[in-house]
Amino acid sequence: MTPSAKRRTLNTHYFMPPHVRVVELMTSGNTAPEIMSLLVDRMKTVGLKPFVAKRESTGFIQNRVWASIKREMLHVVAEGIVDAQTADDIFVETIVRPGTRPFAAMDYVGLDTVANIERTYAQERHLDTTYTVDYLQREFIDVGKLGIKSNKGGFYPPSTAADAVSTKPRIFVLDNGLSGQIDNLKQGKILEYSFEGEYIRTVFKDQYLPDGIAVSQEENVLFWTCMGSPGQKDGMIYAGKLDGNDIRPLIQQGIVHTPKQIVIDEANKKLYFTDREGLCIWRCDKDGSNLEQVVVTGDNNNECDRRDATRWCVGITFSHTLGKIFWTQKGASKGWQGRIFSANMTIPPGETAAHRKDKVCLLEGLAEPIDLDFHESTKTLYWTDRGEMPFGNTLNRLRFDDRGYALHTDSTPHLKHEIIARKFHEAIGLKIDARNEHVYVADLGGSICRCKLDGSDKVRLVFQEDRAWTGVALA
């Protein structure tokens, strides 16, 4: 190879499966720096994520690290410490799902502690300490860089070391399948996106008009509703693992009509979901058992009631702080008939789901309210509205006092609540990230947006014209 050709030669490593957009670049030992820079820029423009190794290394970066992980995994299985399934499971639960970054985690634990742990392993297994304990001692510990507990930081600068450890939620969102070519109504999907809005994978597909979704953090399980054919009694409730396995029906066809938003009451191990044409709100155990109605808004055997959109329950949430459930009855499309109600989580003694004296209409005359969520620490109800301007296609909120009474505001003229974000395109899905003080909104126009709790700093994370997003959840 000529000297000129050597300067234009380098090593590349692409990844499988194809949705992993990472590519590793590594010098051949003679590669011109400008060639590396050129390729990095070009790869970014086509949606790849290039990573550059500073010097030649067998296995590039990722596979060299992966090789060491494989070795230790094989050791714990071969030594009889654990079986392969358990080793995989604990790795996923402690590293993959939380999004743990090794160097950030070491900073968090403390590099002096990390060195002591590695020293113990080295003594027990007769390992070389040149690139572990000795490296940490020389480059970090001896100069006072111990991680986030020291003002000099560690592998990360002190201002970012703690932030690097914090986990960002993964986004799970429903595509109802109605935005593209419609050959049938069972083209819905559940997709996963990163915190930054990058597509990760399709978790489940071939869903029958999926609408509401919730995540059980305790069990790493997705719950979602499939509306079925509008007006027919063929809606279903499903559950499935976050990893895309073990999909199973909780509520079979023939029981509910058109299930919409679904939420999880982890404290009581219950699911709540609305049933639009069923004219009610249901509650059941997380395995689908003990199904019961908690609110009934009309007679679903009566054609007039079933066609009356002012009786249609769509959004549902609850507050343990206030002991209340909240729901929307949306009214006709763009009809300014929408209402938001509340009632106690427990049906009063002697009353029924159809006849509850504790039911309160909080707001009425709304453009078209859809999904709900509740922020416990501020006692604030949030909802999406897909109605017309000026008050539709918005993100809204209503605050409550300690007794559960609504605190009406005049911050938006003619309204008793606040509009905090606007200009969505058929806003539907809603989820609050209380830890990071964010709100996520998904709309039928193909956008997934995030903003702060007050509606500021709104950003569009995802825009796909061929998607019609409904429910959104976080894990």
Swiss-Prot record:
Phenotype when the gene is knocked out: Significantly reduces the production of T-toxin and decreases the virulence to maize.
Record-annotated disulphide pairs: none
Gene Ontology terms for molecular function: oxidoreductase activity, acting on the CH-OH group of donors, NAD or NADP as acceptor
Pathway: Mycotoxin biosynthesis
Family matches, as SUPFAM superfamilies: 6-phosphogluconate dehydrogenase C-terminal domain-like, NHL repeat, YWTD domain
Source superkingdom: Eukaryota
SMART domains: LY (SM00135)
Protein name from the UniProt record: 3-hydroxyacyl-CoA dehydrogenase-like protein LAM1
Gene: LAM1
